[in-house]
């Protein structure tokens, strides 16, 4: 696990199928905000994105990173400029599409991935990150994220958290 690295999906687009399936398994079939086709389009856009900079201009920038351990995909995590929850679109940018291979959960990979994404965000000059979660609030709070909001929607209940990076 010490060899864990984040690689832009654009550098290894052929490796995106496994994390896409994880995303579909968790969120993509029946989510009223983000359909299976939306997930496929998200990964397609990530495979074509410019990872050299964060433009911060309010465009729908989506940077998807594969977590690799010895050239095996063990997770996926994204930095995005928008969120699918309309009420919170004014908060930017977001940690999104964060999934660890189900067979590798509980091994510290998720913490390493989140730390690596935060470092990339800092390098882009991003000062604060946001995310939402359905049931992992404690995981994020242990890593410095502060609880901001809880919302119960007809389709989903979620917590919004934020973290200062600077």
Segments the model singles out, each with a brief description of its role:
Residues 62-66, 72-83, 94, 99:
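Conserved beta-strand in the GNAT
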Residues 23, 27-66:
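Active-site rim helix/loop that mediates acceptor-substrate recognition in acyltransferases
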Residues 123, 127, 134-157:
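Conserved active-site alpha-helix within GNAT-family acetyltransferase domains
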Residues 82-95, 105, 154:
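A conserved beta-turn-beta hairpin within the catalytic core of GNAT-like acetyltransferases
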Residues 62, 156-160:
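Short hydrophobic/aromatic beta-strand or adjacent loop that forms the aromatic wall/cage
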Residues 1-18, 25, 165-166:
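Conserved N-terminal entry element of GNAT/NAT acetyltransferase domains
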Residues 103-104, 108-116:
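Conserved acetyl-CoA pyrophosphate-binding loop and the N-cap/start of the following alpha-helix
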């Amino acid at each position: 696990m010490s060899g864990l690295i984040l690689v832009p999906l654009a550098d290894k687009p052929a490796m995106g199928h496994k994390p896409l399936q994880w995303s579909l398994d968790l969120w993509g079939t029946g989510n009223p905000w983000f359909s299976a086709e939306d997930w496929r389009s998200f990964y397609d856009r990530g495979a074509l994105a410019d990872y050299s900079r964060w433009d911060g201009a309010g465009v729908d920038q989506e940077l998807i990173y594969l977590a690799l351990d010895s050239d095996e995909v063990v997770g996926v995590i994204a930095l995005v400029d928008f969120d699918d929850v309309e009420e919170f679109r004014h908060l930017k940018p977001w940690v999104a599409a964060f999934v660890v291979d189900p067979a590798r959960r509980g091994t510290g990979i998720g913490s390493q991935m989140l730390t690596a994404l935060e470092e990339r965000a800092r390098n882009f000059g991003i000062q604060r990150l946001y995310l939402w979660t359905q049931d992992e609030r404690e995981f994020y709070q242990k890593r410095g994220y502060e609880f901001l909001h809880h919302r119960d929607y007809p389709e989903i209940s979620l917590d919004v958290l934020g973290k200062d990076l600077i």
